[in-house]
Amino acid sequence: MNVLKVSSKSNANSVAGALAAAIRDFSEAELQAVGAGAVNQSVKAIAIASGFLAPSGIVLYAQPSFEAIQIDGEDRTAIRFKITSQKI
């Protein structure tokens, strides 16, 4: 499964484009975010990607979860959004 890592400096439109492409190719993807700014950009990207895919009849569903990760040897908690889709 595609895991797209999102930071607070990520462009939401760029992430949305990558997310929409992953959904078209694989029907599912994941976004991983650490920190409030990154989570904000992720949520905006999901909303934008939903708009990109709606004309094709594709609906997105997002399931958030916590995930323990390591960054530079430090334990951190990430928010992971599992994105699935359904064609209607």
Region roles according to the model:
Residues 36-62:
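Short, hydrophobic/π-rich interface segment
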Residues 32-33:
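Active-site-adjacent beta-strand anchor residues
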Residues 1-2, 88:
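Low-complexity, interaction-prone regions
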Residues 2-29:
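An N-terminal amphipathic alpha-helical segment
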Residues 54-88:
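C-terminal edge-of-domain segments
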Residues 23-26, 49-53, 80-83:
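Short, low-complexity, polar/charged sequence segments that are solvent-exposed and flexible
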